[in-house]
């Protein structure tokens, strides 16, 4: 049975595509649209991509990674028609002239949270002291390997050092290539906690959010979309950006842990 929420969303996509067609903005739907995207938005995009493809005929070829991985991928010259990356990386690309002027669109910002397995008792992580206690008591903690350039992993490692438990955390760390993979480690019982972007936690079955990092420690990452100057299908890329930033998508972003963009 299709839920009311799913039905409403399918309707909004259909309505949105009708508007695109009416104003001559719908993509021609020929070659795959090549997208380089941050893992933090992976869950949301996976929820809408099938409906969007069915309504428009547009197919996609995604390359997903951490900020560090994507920085290297883009520097290597890999072709992309659309990029969805963190605001700092987007700023770097703007400065080097790799983006189509005026194509940047702010998508939202997301914080970091503590993820546990479904059914497990949720530790108190509401204050810095409570979070430190939960980390010390955990048998294992999964997070993105800082060496992979994952924003949440780099930040969490700095928090552990600030707490004075950096070495202790390293001894029981389960390091992964991305936040989604860290949440999967928890879902499959190989780690007790995962410290990942909230958007990555809510997208993985078998886990739940114990809570966001305490306000005094929270670190938000903003994400944006833009069209590279080398894009071979800017019309299709612009249509998808318009879909992502439409009013119909606002609740979808919120339900995936994102807050509205501040810029």
Regions found by a protein language model. Name each.
Residues 27-76, 87-97, 101-110, 116-263:
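Exported/periplasmic ABC-transporter solute-binding proteins
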Residues 10-24:
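Bacterial N-terminal signal peptides
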Residues 1-8:
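N-terminal secretory signal peptides that target proteins for export/translocation
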Residues 81-84:
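Periplasmic-binding protein-like
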